[in-house]
Amino acid sequence: MSETRSEARITLAHEGAATVETGLPVLDHLVAELARAGRFRVALEVAPGSADEAVTAAGRALGRAVTARLDAGSGWAMLPADEALALVALEHAAEGRLVTNVDFSDERVGGVTTDVAARFLEALAVEASINLHVRLVEGTDPQHVLAAIFKAVGAALGQALRPVQPDVEEAV
């Protein structure tokens, strides 16, 4: 089995724009939400293939783009989407992993099962070498849960990707 070709670029432009073509409209939308919340520009393209291959390839491609720019090394965010509330914390690690309390069951959103999100986030974490902690604080609607998670992941990545400013001493 050959790996699906994919490419991602991240620009720290403080604008949150996204051009995403994975072949899965729901994943395209979620990655665009991630970029908006993180206030960075994402260009992500995945060659046509199966849905499973596209999800993993997209996560890996974004992970490669993230690891190339990971500066602060950590970030966290708690963000809502309607009734859902997600908490995300991440840090640079020797071996990336996804740690979550979310039940990514067989619920369907936009024609795909919600486990798509788990596979994407796991591929992102492993490829970017980050420990990605995702906690669902509140939420019942699967679409809102995924939106809250991706927004919180984006905001946490936005923190981790920003250059750390050196301490500035002020004369008194």
Model-derived segments and spans:
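N-terminal intrinsically disordered, cationic/polar leader segments
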Residues: M1-V172
